[in-house]
C-alpha cells in the first residue's frame, strides 16, 4: 500500500502528495490517522506531480500538513446483504445505532457501473400504495422511479413515511432508506416509526444528514443504492427511498466549488446532468430483480424550472407534485392532481375504467379552476346550472382526494386509512356519475372509502 503526505487542507478538500509511480486512481479511498479517529478521503482529481485532490468523508478538523496518508487501493466499500437490515449506518457503512458491529457477509464498492442494456427489464405491473390520489392520478410502476416534488413544508417527508409504511407492510419486501442531507430529527422519527410498525427488520437505513460535510452528503446516496443493488441482484424486489435528492445535488455544488470548477446556471456544478445520470441510471430493474425508488425532491422557492428539479424530472416514471395552494386549503396529502403525471396512466396498463375515471376527475377539476375567476368576480349565482353542478362535484372530489395518514395520526387525531385501488376508482366514479350529489361536501373530507363519506354525512 502506497503512502503519501498531506500538503494542503482547505475545508473539506485535502491535497495529498504521493511518489510519482504510486499515484492513486480517481475514486480510490485513502486513510489518514486523525488523532484518535481514522478519516477516509476520496480521490477526486489528479493534479500532476504526484499530487491528488481529495474530498474528506468526515470532518477535516485536526488535520495538518505532513500527516501520513495510506492508499487503500480500492474505492470506498460498504457492507451489503441481510446483515445491514434493521441497522443505521453512515456513508462508510459503519454502524451509528450503538448496536455493535455489522456481521459482514460481503463488502461492495460504492462506485459501480449501471446494468448493461440487455440486462434491463421493463415491467408494467402496478404498485398499490393505498393513497387514493396517487393510485388514481399518478399510479406507480413496480420497478419504476417516482419523484415527490414540493417546496419547504408541504409534506414530502410525511408522504414518504406513509408510502414506506404502507408498501413495507403490504409489500413485505426489503427496503433501503437513504437520508441525504435531511434533518437528523426526521431520521430519528423515521427510525421510531419503523420500530413501532414492526418493519425495522426489513429496512436498511443509511444517513448522511444536514450537519455532515459535503463529501458524506454527496456519497451517502451511492451507499444506500449499493445496498439496494445487492438485494436486487439476489433476485428480490427492493424499495429504495431517497430523502432528499436535491441535497445530493447541493452537496455536489459545494464539492464542485471547493474543487475549483466554474459554476454553471444558478451556481450549480457544470457536471449536474452527468452526476444525476450516474446515480439515476443505476437505480433500475434488471431481469434478476427490481428496484422501485421513491425520491423526495425539494423545489427551491417553489420553482419547478430550477435546474436541479428540472434535471431530476427527466429520469422519472411518475411525478407527484405537492402544492402549497392545496396545503393551504387544509387538504392533505397536498398532491396537485392537475400537475402530477405518470407514464402508467395508460388504458393499456391500468385498464379503460381507471383511465376514464382519472381523466374525468382531472377535467372536472380543470373546469373548476377556469370557473374560479368568474366566481371571484361575479359570485356563484351568475353560473349556469351545469356549471354549478361542476363546481359542487369538483369541491367534493377535491375533499375526497384528502385522506388520513397512519404516520400523521398524532397530528390529525383520526386513524389512518389504506384504500384499495378498486375502492378508490368506485368512489370517484360515483361522484362523477352524480350518485352523491345530495351529500354535503364536508362529508368527503378526510375519509377513506366512499362508504365512510356516506356514514359521515349522516352525522353532520
From Swiss-Prot:
Function noted in UniProt: Produces ATP from ADP in the presence of a proton gradient across the membrane. The catalytic sites are hosted primarily by the beta subunits.
UniProt-listed Gene3D superfamilies: 2.40.10.170, Bovine Mitochondrial F1-atpase, Atp Synthase Beta Chain, Chain D, domain 3, P-loop containing nucleotide triphosphate hydrolases
Cross-referenced NCBIfam families: atpD
Alphabetical keyword list: ATP synthesis, ATP-binding, Cell inner membrane, Cell membrane, CF(1), Hydrogen ion transport, Ion transport, Membrane, Nucleotide-binding, Translocase, Transport
SMART domains noted in UniProt: AAA
Enzyme class: translocase
GO cellular component terms listed in the entry, alphabetical order: plasma membrane; proton-transporting ATP synthase complex
Pfam families: ATP-synt_ab, ATP-synt_ab_N, ATP-synt_VA_C
Protein name as annotated: ATP synthase subunit beta
Organismal lineage: Bacteria, Pseudomonadati, Pseudomonadota, Gammaproteobacteria, Enterobacterales
Complexes and interactors: F-type ATPases have 2 components, CF(1) - the catalytic core - and CF(0) - the membrane proton channel. CF(1) has five subunits: alpha(3), beta(3), gamma(1), delta(1), epsilon(1). CF(0) has three main subunits: a(1), b(2) and c(9-12). The alpha and beta chains form an alternating ring which encloses part of the gamma chain. CF(1) is attached to CF(0) by a central stalk formed by the gamma and epsilon chains, while a peripheral stalk is formed by the delta and b chains.
Amino acid at each position: 500500500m502506497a503512502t503519501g503526505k498531506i500538503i494542503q487542507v482547505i475545508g473539506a478538500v485535502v491535497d495529498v502528495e504521493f511518489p510519482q509511480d504510486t499515484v492513486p486512481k480517481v475514486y480510490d479511498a485513502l486513510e489518514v490517522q486523525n488523532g484518535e479517529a481514522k478519516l477516509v478521503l476520496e480521490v477526486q482529481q489528479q493534479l500532476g506531480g504526484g499530487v491528488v485532490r481529495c474530498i474528506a468523508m468526515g470532518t477535516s478538523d485536526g488535520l495538518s500538513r505532513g500527516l501520513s496518508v495510506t492508499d487503500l487501493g480500492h474505492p470506498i466499500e460498504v457492507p451489503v446483504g441481510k446483515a445491514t437490515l434493521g441497522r443505521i449506518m453512515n456513508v462508510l457503512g459503519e454502524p451509528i445505532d450503538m448496536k455493535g458491529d455489522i456481521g459482514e457477509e460481503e463488502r461492495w464498492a460504492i462506485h459501480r457501473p449501471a446494468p448493461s442494456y440487455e440486462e434491463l427489464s421493463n415491467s408494467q405491473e402496478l404498485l398499490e400504495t393505498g393513497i387514493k390520489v396517487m393510485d388514481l392520478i399518478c399510479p406507480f410502476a413496480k420497478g419504476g422511479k417516482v419523484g415527490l416534488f414540493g417546496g419547504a413544508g408541504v409534506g414530502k417527508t410525511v408522504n414518504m413515511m406513509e408510502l414506506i409504511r404502507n408498501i413495507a407492510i403490504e409489500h413485505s419486501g426489503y427496503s433501503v432508506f437513504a437520508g441525504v442531507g435531511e434533518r437528523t430529527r426526521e431520521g430519528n422519527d423515521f427510525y421510531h416509526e419503523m420500530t413501532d410498525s414492526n418493519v425495522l427488520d426489513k429496512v436498511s437505513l443509511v444517513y448522511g444528514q444536514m450537519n455532515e460535510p459535503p463529501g458524506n452528503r454527496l456519497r451517502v446516496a451511492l451507499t444506500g443504492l449499493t445496498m439496494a443493488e445487492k438485494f436486487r441482484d439476489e433476485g428480490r424486489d427492493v424499495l429504495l427511498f431517497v430523502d432528499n435528492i436535491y441535497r445530493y445535488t447541493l452537496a455536489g455544488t459545494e464539492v464542485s466549488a471547493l474543487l475549483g470548477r466554474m459554476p454553471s446556471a444558478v451556481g450549480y456544478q457544470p457536471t449536474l446532468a452527468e452526476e444525476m445520470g450516474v446515480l439515476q441510471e443505476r437505480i433500475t430493474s434488471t431481469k434478476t430483480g427490481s428496484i422501485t425508488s421513491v425520491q423526495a425532491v425539494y423545489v427551491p422557492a417553489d420553482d419547478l424550472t430550477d435546474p436541479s428539479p428540472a434535471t431530476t424530472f427527466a429520469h422519472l416514471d411518475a411525478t407527484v407534485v405537492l402544492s402549497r395552494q392545496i396545503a393551504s386549503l387544509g387538504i392533505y396529502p397536498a398532491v396537485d392532481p392537475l400537475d402530477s403525471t405518470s407514464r402508467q396512466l395508460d388504458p393499456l396498463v391500468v385498464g379503460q375504467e381507471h383511465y376514464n375515471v382519472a381523466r374525468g376527475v382531472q377535467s372536472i377539476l380543470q373546469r373548476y379552476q377556469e370557473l374560479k375567476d368568474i366566481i371571484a368576480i361575479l359570485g356563484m349565482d351568475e353560473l349556469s346550472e351545469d356549471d354549478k353542478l361542476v363546481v359542487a362535484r369538483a369541491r367534493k372530489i377535491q375533499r375526497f382526494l384528502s385522506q388520513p395518514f397512519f404516520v400523521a395520526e398524532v397530528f390529525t387525531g383520526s386513524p389512518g386509512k389504506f384504500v384499495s385501488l378498486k375502492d378508490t376508482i368506485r368512489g370517484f366514479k360515483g361522484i362523477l356519475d352524480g350518485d352523491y350529489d345530495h351529500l354535503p361536501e364536508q362529508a368527503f373530507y378526510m375519509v377513506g372509502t366512499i362508504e365512510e363519506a356516506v356514514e359521515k354525512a349522516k352525522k353532520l
